[in-house]
Amino acid sequence: MPRSFLVKSKKAHTYHQPRAQGDELVWPPAVIPVAKEHSQSASPLLSTPLPSQTLDWNTIKQEREMLLNQSLPKMASAPEGPLVTPQPQDGESPLSESPPFYKPSFSWDTLASSYSHSYTQTPSTMQSAFLERSVRLYGSPLVPSTESPLDFRLRYSPGMDTYHCVKCNKVFSTPHGLEVHVRRSHSGTRPFACDVCGKTFGHAVSLEQHTHVHSQERSFECRMCGKAFKRSSTLSTHLLIHSDTRPYPCQFCGKRFHQKSDMKKHTYIHTGEKPHKCQVCGKAFSQSSNLITHSRKHTGFKPFSCELCTKGFQRKVDLRRHRESQHNLK
């Protein structure tokens, strides 16, 4: 068998073949000279010298610069669009350095936003639409809000079925409860107004309870003193007087109150805070009831009338004094 055939067989197979007697190992193998034009287009990895040769880094650097200079004109003439890596030509290595990646003509942000939108949607589209409608209702039509609308979908927990207020972190089990809470506590919007006195409320149930004030019906009677009330909540507050329960103390003077709202109103005396301001004359009050009574001076509304002489009054205390002084009634 010719010697040249044995040498080619060793290059073609990776497994071990027994050498014939007389064969000699030659290291390093003879390097076949390559033409100059072909060597310039070759990859630096293919032109790297073998262990027995001298490692010339300057030559490798020049070959890399030559490859970059040849590829840059191709990139300049390429049309806009996604970059497609060309197939390696004969004599080039796929591991050779490629030109720097350029920005495509389309935006990755639009693609990412479309995918993120599909993952951030709430499980129920009806609940999400209900929350969006609730956010639009929170803005006051009279006083424009300077803050951005609250996005409650960011605090929705699909596994727990709860709704968190982004202002005070209070938790609700239904979106309707969250809507009522934000309308009452944070937005200042009171869409339900009384037809008799003009007082506004944040919920329809509160307005319905308020209408009993203008009627003469007193269906809630105290069993201890016999005093009757139009609302059950007023009776519950009255019962605290008989038990002398005052669980809410003032942090400034120590005075105790039956209700937390009464204690909060009392603290305005120490702080001088007057959060309720008249939109007509600008006068401020510490209690909302005083603002309502003051507003009747501008409108001329007199909700309390005497049943004997039909004279009207803006305050209930004025009607009581009139009955006592003019009609001798108590």
Swiss-Prot record:
Q: In which tissues is it expressed?
A: Expressed in bone marrow and in spleen. Detected in hematopoietic stem cells, erythroblasts, and megakaryocytes. Expressed in thymocytes.
Region described as Mediates interaction with GATA1: 164-330
Q: Which segments does the record annotate as C2H2-type zinc fingers?
A: 163-186, 192-214, 220-242, 248-270, 276-298, 304-327
- The annotated region (Interaction with ARIH2) lies at 91-330
- Enumerate the transmembrane spans: none
Instruction: Reproduce the free-text note on domains from the UniProt record.
Output: The zinc finger domain is essential for erythroid expansion and acts as an activation domain whereas non finger domain serves as repression domain.
The name this protein carries in UniProt is Zinc finger protein Gfi-1b
Q: Which organism is it from?
A: Mus musculus
Source species taxonomy: Eukaryota, Metazoa, Chordata, Craniata, Vertebrata
